[in-house]
């Protein structure tokens, strides 16, 4: 049985709102370690018929969970974030880096990630502007997907934003 036809991707991030994390029971000072263990635990559940995981923050014995994901060995894990340790997290337990767009630094960090990786790491970016030159620069740096934020507004402004992004994509594609 496969619910998504093998299209599921598991996107995670360590978070930024410390008050919200504390309100949900996560000590913000330990969030990076908690995130890593939670991802490792999910990988155990996805890949083992009878999964156990014993970490400092996540601990369980002999659980069963089905259906298993269609992707082997597990769905891609997309690590979001722009913080100083994000590349280490991608290399430790991720399959892709999914930063927020920033006009400076992301392309250099993508090159650093690729040079440090001993395996393919997918690159995608969230929040790009409607600008063909930006899309081109990210594509040349190895980014394969770019997401564009839409305004929280009525239909007219949203449609205009979509039109601008569509025009940028068309210019980037050479249409």
Q: What residue spans do the PLM features occupy?
A:
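Active-site-adjacent structural elements that line small-molecule/cofactor binding pockets in enzymes
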Residues: 1-175
């Amino acid at each position: 049985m496969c619910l998504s036809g093998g299209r599921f991707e598991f996107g995670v991030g360590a978070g930024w709102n410390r008050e919200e994390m504390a309100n949900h029971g996560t000590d913000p000072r330990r969030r990076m370690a908690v995130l890593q263990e939670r991802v490792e635990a999910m990988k155990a559940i996805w890949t083992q018929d009878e999964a156990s995981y014993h970490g400092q923050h996540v601990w369980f014995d002999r659980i069963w969970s089905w259906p298993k994901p269609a992707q082997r060995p597990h769905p891609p894990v997309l690590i979001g974030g722009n913080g100083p340790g994000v590349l280490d997290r991608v290399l430790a337990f991720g399959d892709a880096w999914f930063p927020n767009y920033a006009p400076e630094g992301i392309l250099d960090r993508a090159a650093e990630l690729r040079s440090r990786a001993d395996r393919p790491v997918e690159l995608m970016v969230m929040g790009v502007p409607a600008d063909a030159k930006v899309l081109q620069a990210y594509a040349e740096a190895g980014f394969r997907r770019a997401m564009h934020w839409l305004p929280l507004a009525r239909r007219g402004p949203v449609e205009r934003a979509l039109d601008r992004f569509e025009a940028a994509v068309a210019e980037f594609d050479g249409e």
